[in-house]
């Protein structure tokens, strides 16, 4: 159930129409989790600054039950920053990604939890 959230000051109109689908496929492959469980939440047009500049930037989070940790996070960071740079023109040095390894008992879905 990986969830990837992106808050950005980039306007919606400049984002590719395939953004959600692309990120879903990218994360399904990277995490080894089924695409059916991947959730993507993009919040464009945010009032944001990074380093006292309002140039394009993003603050993101990737949450998952498992598949989060040291070497994996470095790999995800590279993959996601590369995508955001290529598709949204956000330089990698203007992106923060917070990683969260979730306890299955604390994640609800379909009227129950993953525990």
From Swiss-Prot:
Q: Which UniProt keywords apply?
A: Cytokine, Cytoplasm, Immunity, Inflammatory response, Innate immunity, Isomerase, Secreted
Identify the catalytic residues.
Answer: 2 (proton acceptor)
Cysteines joined through disulfide linkages: none
Cite the binding residues for substrate.
33, 65, 98
Q: Where in the cell is it found?
A: Secreted; Cytoplasm
What PROSITE patterns does the annotation carry? MIF
Q: Name one GO molecular function term.
A: dopachrome isomerase activity
The reaction(s) catalysed by this protein are: 3-phenylpyruvate = enol-phenylpyruvate; L-dopachrome = 5,6-dihydroxyindole-2-carboxylate
One GO term of the biological process aspect: inflammatory response
Predominant location of this chain?
Answer: secreted
- The EC number on file is 5.3.2.1, 5.3.3.12
**GO CC field:** cytoplasm; extracellular space
How the protein assembles, per its UniProt entry? Homotrimer.
Role, per record: Pro-inflammatory cytokine. Involved in the innate immune response to bacterial pathogens. The expression of MIF at sites of inflammation suggests a role as mediator in regulating the function of macrophages in host defense. Has phenylpyruvate tautomerase and dopachrome tautomerase activity (in vitro), but the physiological substrate is not known. It is not clear whether the tautomerase activity has any physiological relevance, and whether it is important for cytokine activity.
Family to which the UniProt record says this protein belongs: Belongs to the MIF family.
The name under which this protein is listed is Macrophage migration inhibitory factor
Q: Which gene encodes it?
A: mif
């Amino acid at each position: 159930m990986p969830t990837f959230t992106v808050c950005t000051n980039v306007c919606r109109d400049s984002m590719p129409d395939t953004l959600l689908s692309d990120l879903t496929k990218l994360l399904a492959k990277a995490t080894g989790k089924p695409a059916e469980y991947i959730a993507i939440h993009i919040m464009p047009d945010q009032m944001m600054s990074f380093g006292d500049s309002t140039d394009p930037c993003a603050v993101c989070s990737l949450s998952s039950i498992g598949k989060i940790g040291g070497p994996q996070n470095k790999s995800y960071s590279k993959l996601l920053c590369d995508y955001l740079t290529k598709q949204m023109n956000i330089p990698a040095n203007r992106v923060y990604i917070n990683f969260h390894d979730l306890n299955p008992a604390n994640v609800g879905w379909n009227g129950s939890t993953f525990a």
